[in-house]
Amino acid sequence: MRLSDVSHPNQLHGLTTAQLEDVACQIRERHLQVVSTSGGHLGPGLGVVELTLALYQTLDLDHDKVVWDVGHQAYPHKLLTGRYGDFDSLRQQNGVAGYLKRSESSFDHFGAGHASTSISAALGMALARDRQGKDYKCVAVIGDGALTGGMALEAINHAGHLPSTPFLVVLNDNDMSISPPVGALSTHLNRMRHSAPIQFISDSVQEGVRNIPFIGKEIPQEIKSLTGSVKRLAVPKVGAVFEELGFTYMGPVDGHDIAQMTRTFQAAHRIGGPVLVHVATTKGKGYPYAEADQVGYHAQSAFDLTTGKSIPSKTPKPPSYSKVFGQTLVKICEQNSKVVGITAAMATGTGLDLLQKAIPDQYIDVGIAEQHAVTLAAGMACDGLRPVCAIYSTFLQRAFDQLIHDVGIQNLPVTFVMDRAGIVGADGPTHQGQYDISYLRSIPNFTVMAPKDEAELQRMLVTCLSHDGPTALRIPRGPGEGVTLMEEGWDPLKIGRGEILSEGSDLLIIAYGSMVAPAQKTALCLKESGISATVINARFLRPLDQGLIHPLARRIGKVVTMEEGTLLGGFGSAIVESFADQDIAVSTYRIGIPDKLVHHASPQQSKEELGLTPTAMADNIKKRFGWDNSDSLFVKNSNTSTI
């Protein structure tokens, strides 16, 4: 069968193992061809090709439900569900999404992008099925890295107490998340990977009893209990965690043996109640470079298939904000043993891999457990350490209660560095860092800031660690501005103080963080039209530099705020609120991300669509204030506030 002819996964039914293995080769070929050309997640999907084929052999996806955790391993699923022809548009504007989206396909039963949600969602579907008297299978596919998340364990705890609810969890154990997984559960799973399949030991005992003349067909409960004891004795501790939580444990099964997995899934579907099938896979299977470097090939930009090397950018770029942060933190840790870096399974992405390599004793990876990371840091701060939590903006929102309850209320000196703040591009709405400004500015005792460039990032990190209270620092994805960096000796900033970058009399532009450089370019565009603007680098969201901003606003009378975050409750809202509190009557135009989802596209494409490029912002400012040669003196905009 040609993969290009598959539009429905039920077309796999009836194929021989050899035919399915041929389809597996075609999936890997298409997967590699597209990702090597346009970039995307590589290792996760390559590791679950056979798993996907075997599972879909045993399901009727016109009715049955499959929830893929996170979604970055679901490229084979997409190729089997009618998206082969469009797969070249993967993660591109208006193309196939990199994660699952209910709006994209009827086979995407639950959208995702963050880890550890699949078991809860699939269990919810199973309960809805039973309450409505329907009959279909519900399956969650979750990786061993995502299983470290508290939400996944909460769902397992719940499902295990529902013995009459048929429900299947497939544990895709590749011994990796993005970085190698950590913790006792991961260690336990690693031991299990190398153990004999446990359910088949139980099955063998029961089959032997069934063959006993006269009594075999009537297996008493005592014999069933005995088989459970044999399982525990034969393979000590293997699967015991899940068995004790109420699941029937099956495995570990070779995740690249289609026939064995098909038999296992068929057997699992016949068991009533919750079942966990443990499948051992290799991340990056079938592509030697991805198998050898499973962290580096988790996700890739465009690369050469023959050499495995990334295709270099045509123009050299400055170091990324993440790298500058990591390098600076290493320098600080070398001088202060009380500073500790904490990550939630994102060491490489946040730059903390540099600290891990340089000073491992001052580095902690808690796994995919953002809530735990925040409260762990709070506990460390209670006893004299200076923890620095480096977490993506989109993932930190998972620990909102801990930010308030465990850090903010207790006024503890924990520093949060929010990487990927703002528009991140091809990963789409689940990964945009557009909400941290709004949710952090509401938390008491927090000092919140964002740098205009990588040199200011260095000073802000020192500022955070010099402050006796909770601090948050947002940095964007991608390269810095290319400014000169100091190796050491960074002076802390005065908290709550911004700076004037240029002066003009017609307009006051107040920009925050990554929007400062675009604000300066916007001012130059306006200057070409004879409009002079004062540009302020706000530096701080909380507290605002009202002593700088308010007198200028009163004098100039026209104010524009710029932020790379949602306008609802954002930086612009903070400015407008401060004007209202002081009865400052000015006309204010807020520029940022409107009340909408930002879908997958390149960051530049998203900014163009949102009107966040310097040219677009200059044009909109001229329209807003009647400087566009129109007859109207005043063009209203939905983002405008007049105080």
Curated annotation (Swiss-Prot):
Q: Name one GO molecular function term.
A: thiamine pyrophosphate binding
Q: What organism is listed for this UniProt entry?
A: Prochlorococcus marinus (strain SARG / CCMP1375 / SS120)
Q: Which biological pathway? A: Metabolic intermediate biosynthesis; 1-deoxy-D-xylulose 5-phosphate biosynthesis; 1-deoxy-D-xylulose 5-phosphate from D-glyceraldehyde 3-phosphate and pyruvate: step 1/1
For this protein, the Enzyme Commission number is 2.2.1.7
Tell me the protein's name: 1-deoxy-D-xylulose-5-phosphate synthase
Role noted for this protein: Catalyzes the acyloin condensation reaction between C atoms 2 and 3 of pyruvate and glyceraldehyde 3-phosphate to yield 1-deoxy-D-xylulose-5-phosphate (DXP).
Indicate the family of this protein: Belongs to the transketolase family. DXPS subfamily.
Listed under catalytic activity are: D-glyceraldehyde 3-phosphate + pyruvate + H(+) = 1-deoxy-D-xylulose 5-phosphate + CO2
Cite the record's note on assembly: Homodimer.
What NCBIfam families would the database entry show?
A: dxs, PRK05444.2-2
Q: Which Gene3D superfamilies match?
A: 3.40.50.920, 3.40.50.970
Q: Which gene encodes it?
A: dxs
Enumerate the InterPro entries for this protein: Dxylulose-5-P_synthase, THDP-binding, Transketo_C/PFOR_II, Transketolase-like_Pyr-bd, Transketolase_BS, Transketolase_C, Transketolase_CS
